[in-house]
Amino acid sequence: MTTESKTKTVTHILGYPRVGAQRELKFAQEKYWRGEIEQKELLAVGSELRQRHWKDQSASGLDFVTAGDFAWYDHVLTTSLLLGHVPARHNNGFPDLDTLFKVGRGQSQNSCGCGEAASDMTKWFNTNYHYIVPEFSKNDKFNVSWSQLFDEIAEAQKQGHNVKPVLLGPLSYLWLGKEVNDEEVEQGFDRLSLLPRLLTAYQAIFSKLSALGVEWVQIDEPILALELPKAWADSFKLAYQVIQSDVKLLLTTYFDGVEHHLDKITKLAVNGLHIDVSAAPDQLDAIVSALPKEWVLSVGAVNGRNVWRADLERLHERLQPVKEALGDKLWIASSCSLLHSPVDLDQETELSKETLQWFAFAKQKLREVTLLADALDGNQNAILACHQYSQPLRERESAEHINKPAVQQRLAAITPALAERAEAYSVRAQHQAEKLGLPLLPTTTIGSFPQTSDIRQQRSAYRTGKLNEQDYVTAMKGHIADAVERQERLDLDVLVHGEAERNDMVEYFAENLNGFQATRFGWVQSYGSRCVKPAIVVADIEREAPITVSWTQYAQSLTTKQMKGMLTGPVTILGWTFPREDITRKEIAQQLALVLRDEVSDLQQAGINIIQIDEPAIREGLPIKKSDQKAYLDWAVEAFKISAASAKSETQIHTHMCYSEFNEIIESVAALDADVITIETSRSNMELLKAFEDFNYPNEIGPGVYDIHSPNIPSQEWIVDLIETAAARVPVERLWVNPDCGLKTRNWKETEAALENMVKAAKALRKKWQSNAA
């Protein structure tokens, strides 16, 4: 029997969702960007959310509330402003909130007809969160010029909270950025050389934190979970010697294990270490054994990246020996920031009682942390509560409606042949050229068109029963007809139906497949004001009937041009949903691949000759350790190929990827064997194409020629330049012309203006190059 401990286990979390339970921040941001509210009103929304979130943390019994996790756009961008590190094109010498938004979103064209491009945006490790990439040049200087962190600490202290600030560490900040001057790089510039200057700014930050009476700072160095180059790994020792102060440092890691850097970590001038035992449970024993005796160990036991209820009973059993070994040096926390979790399960009033007992959102995870800590401290009521809390998970393990025999039979029948198309690309390309009759530089879009308020209201009315099915179908067909008419007017070559019926590219499929659970308010931030509402995989996945065929077939009936069928790929559906934790991700991907394979067959039978299977998430699913990546890529590629392999040779399979760095996965991208791949390249000025050029990628490519995430409307000349840059790296006969991504979040005015310039640019170059060829 466990006796009550005399040493209390300290509790905290690594961060909390910023957007609000009802996405209050999103709506305030967008009103501000549209000029509908003043900045003071936006600031008031942020303050109210922070105070609410701190109150929730305090009320749950956490020993610390976390400050510094709030961001107006992205926490890496917030760090850039804190350090006075703003791209010159946006830097007026006095960085403010509008500066931050310009860096993240770009600056619209002004009276001179010019605009300033946003900084690059890319995935935050292997999550679906995006951050704004810091830009580094050899003459960069850093100075603490943005007071948000200090203001929010003071704000929390004024409310009476015990505050633990969070700060992105200097090495991770540098690693997450990029050198932007090719000439400097050629001359040997490496952003790591900026570390001494950067550390001076960090010293100033810690001086200010000390003056605020801060005892502990959570300093995030997630890159320690990577297999770092030696120069980077070796830089940690000096960096932490330089920035040590009277403020205690909790060196914080997540998303994978750090035992491979343990010798270096234990020599750092810090006061404690946080590890993620949800992502990497096997590291725990080695780290407990090697931990300096004066350090605290913060164990990230409650999974911050999924919605499943923590198995507190088993966690208590696993961590009890750690508590006995470490005593009051043990802290309990979330595995990573709860940014990646929805806010509050209590809002989900439409879920069944059984289903509710399976889940915990961010607010509920606060109590999981404190309940587990109480149990580890020997509180008998807490130990009993942990046992009871885990019972729904035990009951689920044996539930017959979770594991379905028919699905298991199809999985067992998968063979290598199931993932191969009948003929090689070189042969398929000839069949497709004859069948499709497309011109040089064919123009298309990625799939979605603007989701107007009418579309959203009609979908909502249908979902709530205020609009009957017949009227809903009529309304959606009207929007499809409008989208087709606009595309015909623009003279695009390959059309799409616009996806008016889809709220989200993953949620739509989840709602139409068995084995998923949708939520009403399960929103998580993707970037800026963009939120997504991932469905939850709760059981084996089946398709009862075709999902996209009727809409696509209707759209095709309105035009003589080719209409693309639009599917979301198996790896992306997996990556953008909350997966089951009782089976492997590979098995879930295979289940999805089989149902999508059936959908491809049905689209083809309905007369659709081009089918796009989007896989924007394929890279973000990579394990962050390179040594673990091959196994993932093998099954991810297989899943895509199973989906596509039912297509005939004359059916053209497209795939789309956005915000991906391809160098490290180019062989796997080629192995997908898609006939056409469209990619995000405009923000990086086509630099992503270098990977395809170096690899001699054999199939067709559509590099994005304008950034749909920015309100800037690209000029025809700008697009011509990008296409010509692309044509220097990819044979022109294999080039497509398209935007970077779907156009769902844009309005029709800017969409049509941008697409008009895109089509004009393609036609001008088509005419020029065909004349030259003649």
UniProtKB/Swiss-Prot annotation:
Family annotation (Gene3D superfamilies): 3.20.20.210
Pfam families for the chain: Meth_synt_1, Meth_synt_2
Chain residues that bind L-methionine: 446-448, 499, 614
Residues that bind 5-methyltetrahydropteroyltri-L-glutamate: 23-26, 123, 530-531, 576, 620
Record: residues binding L-homocysteine: 446-448, 499, 614
Pathway entry: Amino-acid biosynthesis; L-methionine biosynthesis via de novo pathway; L-methionine from L-homocysteine (MetE route): step 1/1
One of the GO biological process terms: methylation
Positions bound to Zn(2+): 656, 658, 680, 741
UniProt keyword Zinc, yes or no: yes
Active site, per annotation: 709
EC number: 2.1.1.14
Family of this protein: Belongs to the vitamin-B12 independent methionine synthase family.
UniProt xrefs under HAMAP family: Meth_synth
Entry protein name: 5-methyltetrahydropteroyltriglutamate--homocysteine methyltransferase
Organism: Aliivibrio fischeri (strain ATCC 700601 / ES114) (Vibrio fischeri)
Gene name of the record: metE
